[in-house]
Amino acid sequence: MNRTLVMTAAACLVATAASAQTPAPDAAPPFVLATYYRCDYSKQTRADTLYKQVIAPLLDKQIKAGHLTAYGFSSHRMGGVFRRLESWTAPTLAHLIAAQDAYEAELAKVNPKAGAEFDAICGSHDDYIWNRTLGSPTNAAAPTPAYSYSRYMGCNLSKEGEADMIMETAFAPIMNKHLAAGHITAWGYFI
């Protein structure tokens, strides 16, 4: 199983186009669907336009329906083969699945051509579902950041509990010091 540490300038999974609502303070850790796209480099800006004009409004509907609490679409900066990252955040796995089902049905109804065009540009992807288990409080009022950073760690399955404990006792205090100093505005640890 992989663990991931996400440090951002303003939100836990940050994107160039993001929307969020503040979860209740006692809410369970959120689930995040992350889709990592391989896109045609020469057409990726068209994919960005399609996302902003067609996909984002449909995801806004999923926030209004209470299925999602946030979503984002990030561009590639360095490393790896993925050109774009889409993230959806939901309070439960059931909400995440409901959002996906409703979104896909709505896109097929209102603009299937745009969906097909986006898929042709970003035709290959990997999907992951993460559960945020540790991190700073979210700040839905924070402005969309210009940059975020993520680190993926492959853990020995028999020692994941130890890795989680090290993250909580060694890394979390360091991240919280950076948060308090204003170097970052949020961070999260997902499993």
Give the role of each language-model region.
Residues 1-4, 21:
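Positively charged n-region of N-terminal signal peptides that target proteins for export
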Residues 20-191:
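Short S/T/G/P-rich N-terminal loop/turn motif that feeds into the first structured element of a domain
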Residues 7-16:
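Bacterial N-terminal signal peptides
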